[in-house]
């Protein structure tokens, strides 16, 4: 039924990554090797190819509008006109330091005034469309490829984590009626906005769970206890935490044990979580679809498990919020394996890879083998360029011709030649997407601690 069975899922901590960017290839390769070796041992297979996901503030979207002249206006738009428009979009160039990962059509417009879902059969002289280009800086993508190549793994393709996550958690009605997917990861928070079944906007906020953990450490909590303290006793909404309940956190010795008021812990968590929610809201507004998201926000990622985080997002954004794990496209018998929202992105990457025809090629050795940096003898991995850039180019059905269209005369040879020349002239132009404008994130940390200090000061004033 087109659903995916998850055979194994392995998660390993990784160092050498900062806000999604690989800073130490050796450490990243080591973590990938450990995870893959464990999965191979569980399943008795050897993995030689991978489809990857990437995330960071170096991934962005940019819109570009272009048009073609309809080849035979008297008989209306046909599939060749749509294909010609897609060819035009193939010619759009990224800035020198970026590469285009995906091109997503947003709409079709005939003669600048009639927006249609299916342009084939519409009458007009010009067919236009706006495409959403998903771009990534070349350097982070090259480092990801290098980390995999060190293990003899061929990277068949790469997708935006924001889009992959959405594919795993969203329901059809949510995609159609409007929703924002918010994936709160360790180093970054990804946002993807969907409307009318199309991804309209993606963005990455360079902070996530690790920023919250760093704030908790300022309460003199040992690093090894931070995550468990946050998950077991933390809350993203301070006024929902107990006012007078204490929790003892052990230090290296009994003498260093520390009592922490849960309300204070929640105050620290809420300050940073509010920052994240406010920046998410700003990205949703920047998308231009804030007023069209009937289904509000879908939260996922490891930090979606934080107590009351959904309530915090409701208060900050004023939108409906639900917490989701990977269910879309996953076979029912596999859903228990991926019930943790932290696995949503990994499942989404698998779904995107299968959609692009980049399913991993595996073999079953007689006995589990250790990972080698060399592919098996005679193995010819699929090349990334073999995956079509427009795998889902729409193939619209030509409407049945009625009496009016049947009586229409085809364009003259002169008109057809003129249209052809116009298309050739257009093909010579290669538009370049504008470089990214950097957002200023510099004030967020001071802003967070100002909130914390204000809250603590107010509490002290009340005691006095």
Describe these PLM feature segments.
Residues 147-161, 248-290:
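Adenine-nucleotide phosphate-binding core of ATP-dependent small-molecule kinases
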Residues 55, 136, 235-237, 292-316:
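Glycine-rich phosphate-binding loops at beta-strand->alpha-helix junctions
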Residues 168-242:
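Acidic, glycine-rich loop-and-beta core segments that form the ion-binding/anion-interacting portion
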Residues 200-201, 210, 214, 261-265, ...:
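Short beta-alpha connecting loops at secondary-structure transitions
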Residues 160-167, 211, 328-331:
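Short acidic loop-to-helix transition motifs that present clustered carboxylates
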Residues 324-376:
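Glycine-rich phosphate-binding/hydrolytic loop that grips phosphoryl groups
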Residues 2-50, 54-179, 222-223, 228, ...:
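Nucleotide/phosphate-binding catalytic cleft detector across ATP-hydrolyzing
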Residues 35-48, 277-295:
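Phosphate/pyrophosphate-binding loops at sites that engage ATP/ADP/AMP, CoA/4′-phosphopantetheine
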């Amino acid at each position: 039924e087109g659903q995916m069975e998850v055979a194994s899922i392995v998660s390993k901590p990784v160092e050498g990554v900062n806000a999604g960017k690989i800073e130490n290839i050796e450490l990243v390769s080591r973590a990938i090797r450990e995870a893959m070796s464990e999965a191979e041992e569980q399943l008795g297979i050897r993995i030689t190819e991978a489809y990857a996901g990437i995330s960071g503030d170096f991934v962005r979207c940019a819109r570009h509008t272009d048009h073609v002249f309809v080849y035979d206006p008297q008989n209306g738009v046909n599939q060749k006109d749509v294909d010609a428009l897609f060819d035009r979009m193939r010619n759009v160039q990224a800035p020198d330091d970026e590469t285009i990962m995906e091109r997503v059509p947003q709409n079709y417009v005939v003669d600048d005034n009639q927006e249609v879902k299916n342009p084939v059969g519409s009458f007009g002289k010009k067919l236009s469309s706006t495409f959403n280009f998903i771009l990534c800086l070349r350097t982070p993508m090259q480092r990801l490829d290098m980390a995999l190549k060190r293990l003899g793994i061929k990277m068949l393709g790469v997708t935006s984590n924001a889009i992959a996550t959405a594919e795993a958690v969203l329901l059809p009605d949510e995609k159609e009626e409007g929703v924002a997917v918010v994936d709160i990861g360790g180093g970054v928070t990804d946002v993807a906005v969907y409307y009318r079944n199309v991804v309209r906007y993606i963005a990455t906020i360079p902070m996530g769970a690790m920023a919250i953990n760093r704030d908790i450490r300022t309460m003199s909590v040992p690093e090894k206890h931070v995550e468990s303290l946050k998950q077991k006793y933390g809350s993203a909404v301070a006024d929902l935490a107990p006012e007078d309940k204490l929790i003892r956190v052990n230090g290296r010795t009994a003498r260093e044990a520390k009592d922490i008021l849960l309300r204070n812990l929640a105050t620290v968590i809420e300050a940073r979580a509010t920052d994240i929610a406010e920046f998410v809201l700003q990205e949703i507004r920047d998308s231009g679809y804030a007023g069209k998201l009937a289904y509000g926000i879908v939260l996922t990622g490891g930090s979606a498990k934080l107590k009351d985080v959904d309530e915090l997002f409701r208060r900050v954004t004023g939108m409906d919020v639900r917490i989701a794990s990977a269910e879309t496209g996953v076979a029912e018998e596999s859903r228990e394996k991926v019930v943790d929202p932290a696995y949503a992105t990994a499942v989404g990457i698998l779904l995107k890879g299968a959609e692009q025809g980049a399913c991993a090629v595996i073999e079953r050795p007689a006995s589990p083998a250790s990972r080698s940096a060399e592919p098996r003898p005679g193995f010819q991995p699929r090349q990334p360029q073999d995956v079509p850039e427009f795998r889902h180019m729409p193939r619209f059905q030509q409407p049945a011709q009625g009496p009016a269209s049947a009586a229409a005369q085809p364009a003259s040879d002169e008109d057809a030649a003129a249209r052809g020349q116009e298309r050739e002239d257009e093909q010579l132009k290669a538009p370049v997407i504008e470089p990214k404008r950097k957002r200023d994130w510099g004030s967020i940390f001071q802003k967070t601690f100002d909130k914390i200090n204000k809250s603590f000061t107010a509490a002290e004033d009340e005691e006095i």
